[in-house]
Amino acid sequence: MSEDTALVVGLGNPGPQYEKTRHNVGFMVAGVLSARMGGKFSAHKKSGAEIVQGRLEGRPTILAKPRSFMNLSGSAVAGLARFFSVDPGNIVVIHDELDLDFGTIRLKQGGGEGGHNGLRSISQSLGTKDYLRTRVGIGRPPGRMDPASYVLKPFSSVERKELDLVCEESADAVELVLRLGLEAAQNRLH
């Protein structure tokens, strides 16, 4: 990818009651990336997000966590993109993915939102679906459990044992796409 500024957004819900839920895996990966950047999140009042500014893979990067609930995260993402003059093609959104087994990581650009209301909000606010996504698999709910309830539950004890590694590998995938671009990163990862 180019030296243009990248906007990397981890999706999640604010508040301690959501901190360890499946829906917040994007926030968890953003935490790993902020440590790698050597920065701490601070409020960016004009966008309604917390950000870290620095470099990832030598590239200028704005790392963000919207402070709104996930379903309303689009306004923060669009606000940051405008404020920092970041084109949608240089935005990477990290999110939970029901349609991937727990721990599976996939990169893609554009496409549908797959029922993910955070992605829908971002697509509507940006006016395009053409941004990069780092999809972190959380698996399907067991039995007849409602997916909306499932994503707001904490990871299982078995999953928690693997969660740190999954977050590290997801952060690696973000760095890979920033360094190599989507196609080369997909070839390495998938």
Swiss-Prot record:
Site (Stabilizes the basic form of H active site to accept a proton): 96
Name of the protein described by the UniProt record: Peptidyl-tRNA hydrolase
Gene Ontology molecular function: any one: tRNA binding
Residue positions of the active site: 23
Family: Belongs to the PTH family.
SUPFAM superfamilies membership: Peptidyl-tRNA hydrolase-like
One of the protein's GO biological processes: protein quality control for misfolded or incompletely synthesized proteins
Gene: pth
Keyword Hydrolase annotated: yes
Species of the source: Rhodococcus opacus (strain B4)
InterPro entries to which the protein is assigned, alphabetical: Pept_tRNA_hydro, Pept_tRNA_hydro_CS, Pept_tRNA_hydro_sf
Coiled-coil segments: none
